[in-house]
């Protein structure tokens, strides 16, 4: 009998014997970028773009699931952009009021704050 990915994982988690060992993967951000070639900033910030990418990778590699790493997802990130520059294929610069960010297919976003952040003492944190 052939199992669906869900049935396979549930069988294994219930200590039953599935048709094969469930296979999952947690991709690095760099690996996901290289495979999918998305807009780097959208992939980082837009939860729907990120989720669609994970589903695509799961199908492409015939995984039974993907272990999700969380990134900078923010539903209103576009509303806070001062400027958005496409530097070249796979490289983007986003400027927000307090910082600039460089997004690429090859690395995590690099963030540069315009003013040095104020570090709170432990007693100042709720």
What are these regions (language model features)?
Residues 1-126:
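Catalytic cores of TIM-barrel enzymes
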């Amino acid at each position: 009998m052939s199992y669906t990915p869900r049935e396979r994982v549930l069988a294994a988690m219930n200590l039953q014997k599935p048709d094969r060992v469930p296979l999952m993967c947690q991709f690095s951000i760099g690996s996901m970028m290289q495979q999918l070639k998305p807009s780097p900033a959208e992939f980082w910030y837009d939860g729907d773009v990120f989720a669609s990418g994970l589903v695509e990778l799961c199908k492409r590699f015939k995984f039974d699931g993907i272990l999700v790493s969380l990134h900078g997802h923010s539903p209103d990130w576009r509303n806070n952009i001062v400027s958005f520059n496409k530097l070249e294929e796979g490289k983007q610069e986003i400027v927000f009021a307090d910082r600039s960010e460089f997004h690429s297919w090859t690395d995590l976003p690099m963030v540069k704050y315009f003013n040095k952040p104020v570090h709170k003492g432990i007693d100042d944190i709720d």
